[in-house]
Design a protein with these regions (language model features):
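Cysteine-centered iron-sulfur cluster-binding motifs in ferredoxin-type domains/subunits
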Residues: 173-182
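The feature marks the mature, well-folded catalytic cores of soluble enzymes
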Residues: 1-174
């Protein structure tokens, strides 16, 4: 199940994203209400309006139930810090934090160019990312996760690093500039 609100709307509608940062921007409130009524069990059509707060609350309740049932979560990561083995998830809704803390097993999938050497480097990227992607000073949620801790969060962890031809691009003196994009 997709946990980002806009991605959830797209998934429940069996639709395709229309924008990389705002995947459901092509859907109006009335459409979203109808999608929720059709896909989320237990919603009352007589009380659910197309008010954004009500729609967000319906999605929150739906997702919370899924989070509490999930034994395994698959998450991405914005950065991985080699110095400490820390993964960083930057987001605006708190859904990533739920993935990092509630399931028994966490599987994180990350492109290799997201691996950075030190905490000092992370500080720079945490300032650049929100300014570059959404023109914000900072993201609402930044979660840092440094592995399994007995009795706290996932007790099993797997990191999948994806290359996708990036090492070939990195080896190319001209092509490597393409990997500078955060």
């Amino acid at each position: 199940i997709e946990t980002d609100l806009a991605e959830l709307i797209v998934q429940l509608a069996d639709d395709r994203p229309s924008h990389i940062l705002v995947p459901a921007i092509h859907r109006g409130r009335a459409e979203i209400r109808q999608i929720f009524l059709e896909a989320m069990p237990g919603l009352d059509p007589g009380t659910l309006t197309d008010d954004p707060r009500q729609l967000a609350e319906a999605a929150r309740a739906y997702l919370r139930e899924a989070f509490l049932r999930a034994r395994v979560a698959v998450s991405g990561a914005n950065f991985g810090v080699v110095e400490t083995g820390t993964l960083t998830v930057v987001e605006s809704e708190g859904n990533g934090r739920m993935c990092l803390t509630l399931p028994e097993t966490l599987i994180t999938v990350m492109w290799i160019e997201k691996v950075i050497p030190t905490w000092r480097d992370l500080e720079v990227f945490l300032q650049l990312l929100p300014r570059s992607s959404t023109a914000e000073r900072m993201n609402p949620y930044t979660s840092l996760w440094t592995g399994v801790q007995p009795g706290d969060g996932p007790q099993e962890f797997h990191l999948v690093l994806l290359d996708g031809g990036r090492t070939d691009v990195l080896a190319d003196e001209v092509g490597r500039a393409a990997l500078h994009c955060i």
